[in-house]
Curated annotation (Swiss-Prot):
Interacts with BSG; interaction mediates SLC16A3 targeting to the plasma membrane. It is a multi-pass membrane protein. Belongs to the major facilitator superfamily. Monocarboxylate porter (TC 2.A.1.13) family. The chain crosses the membrane at residues 18-38, 62-82, 85-105, 110-130, 150-170, 180-200, 232-252, 268-288, 299-319, 322-342, 356-376, 392-412. Its main location: membrane. It catalyses: (S)-lactate(in) + H(+)(in) = (S)-lactate(out) + H(+)(out); pyruvate(out) + H(+)(out) = pyruvate(in) + H(+)(in). It comes from the Eukaryota. Proton-dependent transporter of monocarboxylates such as L-lactate and pyruvate. Plays a predominant role in the L-lactate efflux from highly glycolytic cells. Residues 429-447, 447-471 are annotated as: Basolateral sorting signal. This is Monocarboxylate transporter 4.
Length: 471
């Protein structure tokens, strides 16, 4: 589903559901891939960073957490920038920031400097690309929006399949510094995607005249009215709890395998398996959600996806060998893909198109706090116990709790709300028949009108002059 991005085009623009929208979808696919896969892909460098700086699991986990926190927490800033400058310029600047952060990180001499470069600068750059790309996608698609969101969300697993082995390969050949430098160059592709975000323009009236219509009020940079929506509040609370555990398994599964004695390349392949399954899960979930009979119940489908994900984490905690982790990654990829494809589609279904830009930024801001807590808390638990099982149990419990909050909240607070009395279908049909019935032809006799006009004044003793007698 921050500060309200009110970067809306002129009134009367209909979403094309195709055309240049496919180019926008491709750009959103790339941006989503970098935004979500990058925080997980950098985890392949964690072991070498621990040896380089003499730090623990929780210290390296902060890199992914800060990246995700910037991606989520800068929602209001992205909103105001887009409202002021538009989607395309903001994304161009964001692409430069994302690249600059990784290039600068390759020269860092302490973990704090990596937090500032990879975490803050690159994270800000990805945020300035991610939110505007989603806004543009939802402007170009309406009827096909669930499918478009599912296809765009598939960018995350596709890039995860590519970036994780690539990161391991770069680390083996060039070390973590050379790997960061090359990844910084790859992030410049965000600028290419920004160029695809062509704004929608209202069609001109015949003769080149500007279309006449009501003037829109000046947009607000921060629209907090969405907090009066009960459905939005339930979604925001559930999503914040979900994020506490959602990103923990992908961050730790590679280290989990290495701790079992699995070779580094084979361990990194787990993320490729997860991503490969995720590639098919997201478009499939988007297609199913777009079905007429399913779309009204998308909130409950999203709740099921969260429950499935949390249950997978709990069962994954029992894995004792590489085969068990492979099975875990397969089912985690399915559930994770469902969550990724549905989260923003459900948010739009709850708040509507007009308030989506406000709602998404505010939700991302709320989730930022949870992102800062999730992976580091898992790292702290791992440092204290040295047992990966407890990390996966904690993550699963958090995601399961979020699914119950969303399900029960919508069922009891939304679905059970007292609805106004509905008129019977027969009465509705009768009323419509009366409304569409042609009026009775009432004829007026001019002589009766003349007689009435003469009679009224005579009652008061007045003299009446008709047009004929006045000549």
């Amino acid at each position: 589903m921050g500060g309200a991005v009110v970067d809306e085009g002129p009134t009367g623009i209909k979403a094309p559901d195709g055309g240049w929208g496919w180019a926008v979808l491709f750009g959103c696919f790339i941006i989503t891939g970098f935004s979500y896969a990058f925080p997980k892909a950098v985890s392949v460098f964690f072991k070498e960073l621990m040896h380089e700086f003499g730090i623990g699991y929780s210290d390296t986990a902060w890199i992914s957490s800060i990246l995700l926190a910037m991606l989520y927490g800068t929602g209001p800033l992205c909103s105001m920038c887009v409202n002021r400058f538009g989607c395309r310029p903001v994304m161009l600047v964001g692409g430069l920031f994302a690249s600059l952060g990784m290039v600068a990180a390759s020269f860092c001499r302490s973990i704090i400097q990596i937090y500032l470069t990879t975490g803050v600068i690159t994270g800000l750059g990805l945020a300035l690309n991610f939110q505007p790309s989603l806004i543009m996608l939802n402007r170009y698609f309406n009827k096909r929006r669930p499918m478009a969101n599912g296809l765009a969300a598939a960018g995350s697993p596709v890039f995860l399949c590519a970036l994780s082995p690539l990161g391991q390969l770069l680390q083996d050949h060039y070390g973590w510094r050379g790997g960061f430098l090359i990844l910084g160059g790859l992030l410049l592709n965000c600028c290419v995607c920004a160029a695809l975000m062509r704004p929608l323009v209202a069609p001109q009236a015949s003769g080149g005249a500007e279309p006449h219509g009501p003037q829109r009020p000046s947009p607000r940079l921060l629209d907090l009215s969405v907090f009066r929506d009960r459905g939005f509040l339930i979604y925001a609370v559930a999503a914040s709890i979900m994020v506490l555990g959602l990103f923990v398994p992908p961050v730790f599964v590679v280290s989990y395998a290495k701790d079992m004695g699995v070779p580094d390349t084979k361990a990194a392949f787990l993320l490729t398996i997860l991503g490969f399954i995720d590639i098919f899960a997201r478009p499939t979930a988007g297609f199913i959600t777009g079905l007429k009979k399913v779309r009204p119940y998308s909130v409950y489908l999203f709740s099921f996806a969260m429950f499935f994900n949390g249950f997978t984490d709990l069962t994954g905690s029992t894995a004792s060998d590489y085969g068990g982790l492979v099975v875990f990654c397969i089912f985690f990829g399915i559930s994770y893909g469902m969550v990724g494809a549905l989260q923003f589609e459900v948010l739009m279904a709850i708040v509507g198109t007009q308030k989506f830009s406000s709602a998404i930024g505010l939700v991302l801001l709320l989730e930022a706090v949870a992102v800062l807590i999730g992976p580091p808390s898992g790292g702290k638990l791992l440092d204290a116990t040295k047992v990966y099982k407890y990390v996966f149990i904690l993550a699963g419990a958090e995601v399961l709790t979020s699914s119950l909050v969303l399900l029960l909240g919508n069922f009891f607070c939304i679905g059970k709300r007292k609805r106004p009395e509905v008129t019977k279908p027969e009465e509705v049909a009768s009323e419509e028949e009366k409304l569409h019935k042609p009026p009775v032809d009432v004829r007026v006799d001019s002589r009766e009108v003349e007689h009435f006009l003469k009679a009224e004044p005579e009652k008061n003793g007045e003299v009446v002059h008709t047009p004929e007698t006045s000549v």
